[in-house]
């Protein structure tokens, strides 16, 4: 009665809100449950998938499932849902060829600086994509038609977590994942770039090639790949040749082509316990940067911080970076290395690192180089990191949040800014999010300052880089 009476309301906005509320109330009080389940999590256009429609009525209320509509395909049902009797219907379904890949709508187009380009403004503001497959269940409840929508999902049973739901995604028949998002050509015009090719469907073949700027040469011209089973992987290499090119920055794209279409997307999963699985289909591209670099040091010992990508970057420019643990740090081991680096927030991972001071000071006295990176002020004070350092300093909560805030060099002749490579203001171009935070605001006279920066109207932060020479 009440649901039908809502049709008399002329205000469409409030009518829709109240209809939704009553539908949720009907669903809750009858214990009505329904879902649409795919046998796979991801399928390419043209793939055949199996879909199970399931429903149960946990009440004596007279409920009849009349039909289910999926992407304009009507599936007649006409089944009376008797109290606590489970209903299931399985169908085979071909994924339409015209469906777009399920990439996040704000990431389909490559963003520019601080701006995302969205093709369909109707998506704007939505926290995620709407499901590519929506099933509509048409019920007759006590003589009244009530319709509910259900997104297509893949469900597995996890022994510890129970039912594990993943939103069904439309993918490609093939994915290309570059090994690195950025490749650095250091003192060289040629380099092999590695990609991983993954089959998105059974019995699929294509040619993998490169879209490169004019003048950038590569070999081979293409790789022919064939897969028997979905999920198979192959690793391929292309040699990129920048000989004779004056530019130092390039973007290259990888493409897979079959008889009908071409594809230039990879696949990536963001998987954490506290959020639903996020499936991404990023563009298959690599940024190339070419430059010359003088390296006095070759071997670096590194103590990792959480989510630390610095070792990867150092490896790309030719350093040998060994990830060590607290237990491996001793003078004999450190003598093998040109430098020891504490990772970003390394003390968050292992508080006992502060106990390494005797070994590290001996290493420094013998001529070793030690770099301690970013730490928060609370961690600094709670762990009394001042007792770990050779000289005192205090960490503040000061920050430089303006990405383009000018950087000023305070000591242009300092060796750290000139050897083995000269550091100039251009090296601070392209820093994003912010210039820095948790700057030291007090330090011993034994430290030298190299750079300073500040937001408009704020005091300069001279403690971005502090250096002290000890021993050899």
Predicted segments, located by residue:
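The feature marks non-catalytic terminal segments
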Residues: 1-28
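Proline/serine/threonine-rich low-complexity linkers at boundaries of modular beta-sandwich domains
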Residues: 21-33, 164-174
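A glycine-rich, often tryptophan-bearing local segment used as a flexible ligand/cofactor-contacting loop or short
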Residues: 345-428
């Amino acid at each position: 009665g009440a649901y039908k009476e809502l049709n008399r309301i002329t205000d469409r906005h409030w009518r829709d809100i109240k209809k939704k509320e009553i539908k949720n109330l009907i669903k809750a009080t009858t214990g009505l449950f329904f879902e649409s389940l795919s046998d796979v999590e991801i399928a390419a256009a043209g793939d055949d998938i199996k879909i199970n429609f399931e429903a149960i009525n946990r009440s004596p209320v007279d409920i009849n499932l009349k039909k289910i509509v999926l992407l304009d395909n009507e599936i007649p049902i006409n089944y009376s849902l008797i109290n606590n009797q489970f209903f299931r219907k399985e169908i085979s379904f071909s994924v339409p060829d015209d469906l777009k890949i399920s990439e996040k709508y704000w990431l389909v187009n490559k963003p520019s600086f601080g701006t995302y380009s969205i093709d369909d403004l109707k998506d704007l503001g939505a926290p995620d994509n709407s499901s590519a497959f929506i099933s509509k269940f048409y019920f007759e409840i006590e003589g009244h038609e009530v319709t509910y929508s259900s997104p297509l999902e893949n469900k597995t049973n996890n022994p510890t977590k129970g039912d594990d739901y993943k939103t069904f995604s439309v993918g490609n028949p093939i994915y290309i994942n570059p090994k690195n998002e950025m490749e650095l050509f250091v003192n060289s015009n040629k380099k092999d770039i590695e990609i991983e090719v993954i089959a998105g469907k059974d019995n699929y073949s294509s040619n993998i090639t490169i879209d490169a700027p004019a003048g950038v040469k590569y070999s081979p011209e293409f790789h022919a790949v064939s897969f028997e089973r979905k999920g198979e992987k192959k690793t391929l290499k292309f040699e990129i040749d920048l000989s004779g090119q004056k530019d130092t920055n390039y973007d290259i794209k990888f493409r897979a082509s079959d008889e009908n279409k071409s594809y230039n997307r990879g696949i990536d999963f963001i998987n954490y316990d506290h959020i639903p699985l996020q499936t991404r289909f990023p563009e298959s591209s690599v940024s190339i940067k070419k430059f010359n670099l003088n390296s006095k040091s070759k071997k670096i010992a590194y103590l990792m911080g959480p989510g630390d990508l610095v070792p990867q970057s150092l490896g790309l420019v030719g350093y040998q970076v060994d990830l060590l643990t607290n237990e491996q740090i001793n003078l004999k081991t450190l003598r093998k290395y040109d430098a020891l680096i504490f990772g970003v927030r390394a003390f968050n991972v292992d508080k006992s690192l502060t106990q390494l001071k005797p070994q590290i000071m001996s290493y420094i006295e013998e001529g070793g180089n030690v770099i301690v990176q970013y730490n928060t002020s609370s961690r600094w004070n709670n762990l009394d990191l001042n007792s770990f350092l050779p000289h005192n300093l205090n960490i503040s909560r000061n920050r430089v949040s303006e990405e383009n805030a000018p950087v000023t060099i305070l000591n242009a002749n300092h060796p750290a800014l000139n050897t083995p490579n000269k550091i100039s203001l251009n090296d601070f171009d392209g820093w994003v999010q912010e210039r820095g935070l948790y700057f030291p605001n007090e330090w011993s006279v034994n430290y030298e300052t190299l750079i300073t920066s500040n937001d408009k109207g704020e005091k300069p932060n001279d403690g971005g880089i502090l250096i002290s020479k000890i021993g050899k």
